[in-house]
UniProtKB/Swiss-Prot annotation:
Organism of origin: Gallus gallus (Chicken)
Domain commentary: A pair of annexin repeats may form one binding site for calcium and phospholipid.
UniProt-listed InterPro entries: Annexin, Annexin_repeat, Annexin_repeat_CS, Annexin_sf, ANX5
Keyword Repeat set for record: yes
One record GO biological process: negative regulation of coagulation
PANTHER family for the chain: ANNEXIN, ANNEXIN A5
GO CC annotation, single: vesicle
Keywords, ordered alphabetically: Annexin, Calcium, Calcium/phospholipid-binding, Repeat
Designated gene of the protein: ANXA5
Keyword Calcium listed: yes
GO molecular function, one term: calcium channel activity
Residue ranges of Annexin repeats: 15-86, 87-158, 170-242, 246-317
Protein name: Annexin A5
General function of this protein: Collagen-binding protein.
Amino acid sequence: MAKYTRGTVTAFSPFDARADAEALRKAMKGMGTDEETILKILTSRNNAQRQEIASAFKTLFGRDLVDDLKSELTGKFETLMVSLMRPARIFDAHALKHAIKGAGTNEKVLTEILASRTPAEVQNIKQVYMQEYEANLEDKITGETSGHFQRLLVVLLQANRDPDGRVDEALVEKDAQVLFRAGELKWGTDEETFITILGTRSVSHLRRVFDKYMTISGFQIEETIDRETSGDLEKLLLAVVKCIRSVPAYFAETLYYSMKGAGTDDDTLIRVMVSRSEIDLLDIRHEFRKNFAKSLYQMIQKDTSGDYRKALLLLCGGDDE
């Protein structure tokens, strides 16, 4: 596994799983619940340590920590604490399973995860999905989606993006021209061309293609996608382009729109804050401040409340004002 160092949550030291398990049991035993203790422990330990705490909790008390959290806590705060307890290994597979379960498909989750994860991460998600749920993720997704949106999801699921290496300028020029002809210069749009190029070329190659495209056409590739496509395909193509440019900037924007305007998309807020907390949340905070003229910390503070807010702010790990 790649070693990530840009997270806000790191291994806590000195760590004592038994002491943490005892403190959590005490916080939930008897009348009332000590939410403060729960949120302080769970947001300051990394995911591997949380699994050790759960194991110690089972050994000491014969109880399931997640079940106890579910019975003692409620609402968004409960969802956040339970998400923090989910083993990192299965986090994405679990989110995808729930995105394609029951009535209606949550295209937003499919888009966010499959556009932003590396090929190695996607391969891992597919394996975990099969192990945990005894089902083929690609089959499940194709059963719930259709059209060009489905085609691009399938391409991304193959995790066959070219590895980064020396960029061939002739191929950059060719791809930029082909994209221009497939969209702006054509009556209608050749979606397959966008899907193939954006779904399979290397990150460094595509960054050059986007620059070249701007030179040739006078448009940012995002403007063309916006004009030439619509619906779920448009959202997925845009997410892929944004992640090719910068994954932290993509997540900064995702977090911003989860809180902007009336109401909050708490599912997205929780999913991103938890899943990126040990990977690149420091970089996401930096991009957030740069692109939205306010800090992620301030926006969370303004948009949420109670123990839920306290826990999110601890995960955020600091203000960038």
